[in-house]
């Protein structure tokens, strides 16, 4: 994508950024880092961003100990695998990594100010497509070049967002997860809805030099999954595949981020924390497992603001 901006060329940095993203994003995951502020994109302006983070979830860490990794490696080398507790543990680990993986995350985004209080955008998270909108219900709606009346340093802004992500989920590229998948033939899809309530205080008029933001987040996820192993047996009977199952769960969290820069370019460190009870999940041969945990999402974002030069 080419961006025009007076006196500067962003082509090389953009290409380098895209290449770095491809290297760092090892698996697809719906982005949950909140790097927005309470102020939406001013009408007629664009914002282009890149965000790099890390999803640190306790559920998959709990399910993936050294013994399980060894069991996965051993099972992957066998022509037939005996059904038992180890197979159930492999399934639980696969589910935990799909529901909330431990992995790097990255996304490229673009936003546009549709009207004074509303903007919308698209994110590509390397396998996950994300569409979102944000409505500002508190604070002025001008720009650093044309600040609204009352826009001074310390002004409070507030908004509410709506983000929808869809993806064909896959396990992260880790050797023991590849072993699990070769045994279980695991498949999954998921959709995610995220609603952040964002409050921020401006640094300079209309966030000219940045802002500090914080707030609460509600998220809801819908997951479909199944297992279709070819060589798992109980005695002499082959274990049948698990038909596609559908589950959904809610997440609750909070976040804080710091936007620092000047007018056109900003750096945004952020951290989000979520708690979720994923619920109960059916496994092969009538078994089941339940999962819950906490997720930490530290991130670092970069944002380029493209003003409306027609004003």
Protein language model features and the residues they cover:
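Bacterial N-terminal signal peptides that target proteins for export
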Residues: 2-15
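Outer-membrane beta-barrel domain signature
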Residues: 93-94, 106-107, 114, 124-126, ...
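Short amphipathic beta-strand and strand-loop transition segments with alternating hydrophobic
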Residues: 162-164, 218
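Outer-membrane beta-barrel transmembrane domain signature
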Residues: 51-70, 75-89, 173-311
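Transmembrane beta-barrel domains of Gram-negative outer membranes and organellar outer membranes
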Residues: 29-158, 165, 296
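C-terminal motif of bacterial Sec signal peptides marking the signal peptidase cleavage site
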Residues: 24-27
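Long amphipathic alpha-helical segments with strong coiled-coil/leucine-zipper propensity
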Residues: 159-161, 174
């Amino acid at each position: 994508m080419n961006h025009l901006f007076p006196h500067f060329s962003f082509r090389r940095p953009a290409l380098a950024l895209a290449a770095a993203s491809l290297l760092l994003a090892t698996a697809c995951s719906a982005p949950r880092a909140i790097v927005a502020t309470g102020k939406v994109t001013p009408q007629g302006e664009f914002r282009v961003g890149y965000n790099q983070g890390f999803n640190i979830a306790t559920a998959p860490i709990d399910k993936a100990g050294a013994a399980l990794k060894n069991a996965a490696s051993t099972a992957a080398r066998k022509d037939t695998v005996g059904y038992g507790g180890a197979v159930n543990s492999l399934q639980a680990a696969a589910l935990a990594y799909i529901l909330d993986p431990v992995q790097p995350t990255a996304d490229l985004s673009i936003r546009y100010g549709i009207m004074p209080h509303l903007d919308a955008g698209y994110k590509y998270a390397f396998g996950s497509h994300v569409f979102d909108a944000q409505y500002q219900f508190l604070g002025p709606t001008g720009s650093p070049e044309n600040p609204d009346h009352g826009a001074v340093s310390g002004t409070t802004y507030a908004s509410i967002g709506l983000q929808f992500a869809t993806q064909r989920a896959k396990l992260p590229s880790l050797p023991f997860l590849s072993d699990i998948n070769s045994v279980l033939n695991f498949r999954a899809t998921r959709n995610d809805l995220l609603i952040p309530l964002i409050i921020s205080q401006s640094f300079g008029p209309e966030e000219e030099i940045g802002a500090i933001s914080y707030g609460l987040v509600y998220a809801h996820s819908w997951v479909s999954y199944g297992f279709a192993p070819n060589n798992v047996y109980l005695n002499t009977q082959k274990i049948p595949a698990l038909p596609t199952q559908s589950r959904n769960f809610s997440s609750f969290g909070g976040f804080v981020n710091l936007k620092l820069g000047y007018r056109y370019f900003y750096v945004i460190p952020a951290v989000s924390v979520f708690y979720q009870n994923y619920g109960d999940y059916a496994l092969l041969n009538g078994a089941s497992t339940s999962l819950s945990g906490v997720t930490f999402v530290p991130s670092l974002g970069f944002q380029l603001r493209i003003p409306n030069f027609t004003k």
